[in-house]
Amino acid sequence: MSALFSLVAVYVLVCALHKQIKKYASVCYLGSACVSVAVVCVVWSGATKGNFGVRVLLHPLTSASFSTAIFTFVMCASVLKNGLLKQRVMGLRAELAITAAILTLGHNIAHGRDYLVRLCGSTGDLSTGFLVAGAVSMVLVLLMSILAVTSFKVVRRRMGAKTWKRVQRLAYLFYGLTYVHLSFILLPTALRGYIPSVVSYVLYTVIFATYALLRVRKALGKRKGACALCSAAVAVSFVAFVLGASHMVRHTRRAHTERTTRAKARKCSPAEMKDGVYEASAQGHNGKLSLRVTISQGRIEAVTVVGHSDDDPYASWAVEGVSAAIVGAQSTDVDVVSEATSTSEAIIRAVEKILQQPQP
């Protein structure tokens, strides 16, 4: 949902403050840098733990949804129909790109520390999606840095027009890899039925696919058969998108049905278990999550997550919230934590494995 909110917010800001952004670009850069530093401090300090309102408010910044929305307008500006919006965005492409890059760096630094720690350690428990997303992120940071630096007028003048244009063609690779990165981040939770991820992924898919088709059409120009080729591509893409969306909807419904059925069928009772400390693991968003459950006098005394590969601070919210909820309810029939669905479900599945162990 933050993707949709961010796109609307950027649209309003560009329409309302285009003159101020152009005139006071340096102020925008400085403000973006301050916001990035604040995001890093908030994420590293864990200040959002236990405060749902703050998490929701800061999510567009901590998740880079807002900076991605800015890049989306920069990307789509060249293929928009001539009009007021295109005129305003085209006049601000450099300023918007630099601002988005600064904001994105805050996101990269905030979450990059955990990525690097896990990548430098044992990768055996990390999912393929996590490894690919991490590798793509590194390439994106490099491309983004090059494009942002060359967007400054002083650098552009020294490079020369031809060289600058060749470098700026890297933007196409940047946009393509951005969609790949978003897919690896959003698809796992979207396919598990998390509605905000479904909405964001469908929205990004429509935007990036539309841009790609319009960009190809513009590149072909008035060549013979160009319109027919683009029309055919649009038709094929539309059919593919409908089929993919239908599959996602069916998968989402099936996942929801399985969760509902599993919840109804649960007969996991700690009262039937002997006292002791039990261990189990389950697949999280990025890899294996391991935990221990302490049983005493027929009650769950503690649920302790001893290791996971999921992204903080989101995973920490699930570890704190779901673990406490299970202890409080003495059951695994508890709600997942918003924005940490995969980690929440992994905790629940691992505890269920323990409670379903046969007792002598």
UniProtKB/Swiss-Prot annotation:
**Predominant location:** membrane
* Locations listed in the record: Cell membrane
User: What InterPro entries has UniProt attached to this entry?
Assistant: Fe3_Rdtase_TM_dom, FMN-bd
The Swiss-Prot or TrEMBL record annotates one GO molecular function as:
FMN binding
What stretches pass through the bilayer? 26-48, 58-80, 89-111, 126-148, 169-191, 195-214, 227-249
- What topology in the membrane does the UniProt record assign? Multi-pass membrane protein
Q: Which UniProt keywords apply?
A: Cell membrane, Membrane, Transmembrane, Transmembrane helix
Q: What is this protein called?
A: Uncharacterized protein TP_0572
Organism, scientific name: Treponema pallidum (strain Nichols)
